[in-house]
């Protein structure tokens, strides 16, 4: 069985070491790189093609915060992102996860959940991914949600004119901050298989 390829991103050398020891000691995981900042993480994600990216949310003074780096990685690669954070405020973490199109998150205070979360995310989804997806879709009207599901290839009856549907497609992409339908399908295949 192929190991889960993991890229870790954290600006704290002590936490980097902890990630190296924890993930690196797992027989079903391969730590492909550890990066101290978002810019390097984006490059490493393209170079190493990880399955999972562990992204620290608070990358201090590194030029790109964790949520933005995670979003860039999600938009440009097939990697799934797990947000790591010392911030125990759930709303902050959900907001960042939504912005980053993350698959899940782990509070650093609950570090023992990291390995199971990596495995669950690599296998398909976590309970958090459903929460994040629901939060992402919250901004859409019911008509836009129907159009959203049709864009994903779901069999949905759309009761509008072609022009209205085209306008709703544009609205869905704008609200989700996505450039096109292909990117929407790429991002949401993580949440909906």
Language model feature labels by segment:
Residues 2-15, 19-23:
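Conserved acidic segment of CheY-like receiver
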Residues 43, 64-77, 95:
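Short amphipathic alpha-helix used as the core "switch/output" element in two-component signaling
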Residues 48-59:
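Active-site beta3 strand of CheY-like receiver
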Residues 78-89:
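A short, hydrophobic beta-strand element within the central beta-sheet of small alpha/beta folds
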Residues 130-170, 174-175:
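Helix-turn-helix DNA-binding segment
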Residues 170-193:
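Basic, Lys/Arg-enriched C-terminal extension of HTH/homeodomain DNA-binding domains
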């Amino acid at each position: 069985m192929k190991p889960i390829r993991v890229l870790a991103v954290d600006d704290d050398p002590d936490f980097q070491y902890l990630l190296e020891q924890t993930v690196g000691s797992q027989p079903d995981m391969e730590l492909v790189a550890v990066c101290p900042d978002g810019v390097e993480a984006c490059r490493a994600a393209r170079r190493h093609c990880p399955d999972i990216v562990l992204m620290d949310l608070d990358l201090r003074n590194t030029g790109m915060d964790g949520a933005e780096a995670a979003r860039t990685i999600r938009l440009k690669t097939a990697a799934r992102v797990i947000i790591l954070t010392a911030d125990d405020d759930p709303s902050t973490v959900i907001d960042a996860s939504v912005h980053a199109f993350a698959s899940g998150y782990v509070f650093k205070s609950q570090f023992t959940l990291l390995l199971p979360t990596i495995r669950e995310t690599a296998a398909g989804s976590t309970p958090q991914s459903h929460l994040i997806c629901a939060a992402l879709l919250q901004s859409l009207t019911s008509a836009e949600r129907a159009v959203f599901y049709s864009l994903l290839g779901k069999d949905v009856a759309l009761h509008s004119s072609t022009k209205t549907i085209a306008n709703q497609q544009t609205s869905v992409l704008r609200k989700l901050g996505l450039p096109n339908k292909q990117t929407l399908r790429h991002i949401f295949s993580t949440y909906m298989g």
